[in-house]
Amino acid sequence: MSRLKTDAIRNTSASADALTFDTNGNTKIADNELADYEEGTWTPTWTGVTNNASYNSWKYIKIGKMVMIWGTLIPSATTNDSTDVKSDLPFTQAANHTNGLAQTVGSISTHHVNWTKEGVTPIIQAGVGMRIQEIQDDAGLGYMVSSSVAVNDQLMITVTYEAAT
């Protein structure tokens, strides 16, 4: 467990715009500034499904460039075809780092879902937004399409990703 050292507190300054940490007593630099903190709600725009109106309000917290989002997807309708299930994000994601994916950490808990997949996980893709990746034993990876989710399936989703700014 790390602790905040007292010398770090002495070298911390606050202004109307930022909280700055100076670890060596020298001039403060932008890399050590926490100038952006925000929390709120937003309504994701979904493709491939229509979310139950009671679950349209998702939450987010943004600290610096890290954004954590969470909410519930319970489709009230699907296009029941090969349309990818995806949504926009409250903040533009950073450029892709590897394999076309942005830095993402997330999880999905499900209820009332009848899938033959080994698992699902949310991913963030620059220029696309949030997609749900399906994991199939010995068959690779794919993206969830509207025909693989049914009305009233419940997906509780949490994702942390890097924003562009």
Report residues per predicted region.
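Surface-exposed ligand/attachment interfaces on beta-rich extracellular proteins
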Residues: 11-17, 39-63, 72-97, 141-151
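A short, structural micro-pattern
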Residues: 3, 21, 83, 126, ...
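Substrate-binding and catalytic surfaces of secreted/luminal carbohydrate-active proteins
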Residues: 67
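Glycine-rich, low-complexity segments
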Residues: 3-52, 94-99, 105-107, 156-165
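Domain-scale recognition of soluble eukaryotic interaction modules
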Residues: 120, 126-165
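Beta-strand-rich, repetitive solenoid scaffolds
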Residues: 4-13, 18-23, 28-35, 58-61, ...
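Terminal beta-strand-rich extracellular "head" domains
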Residues: 73-129, 133
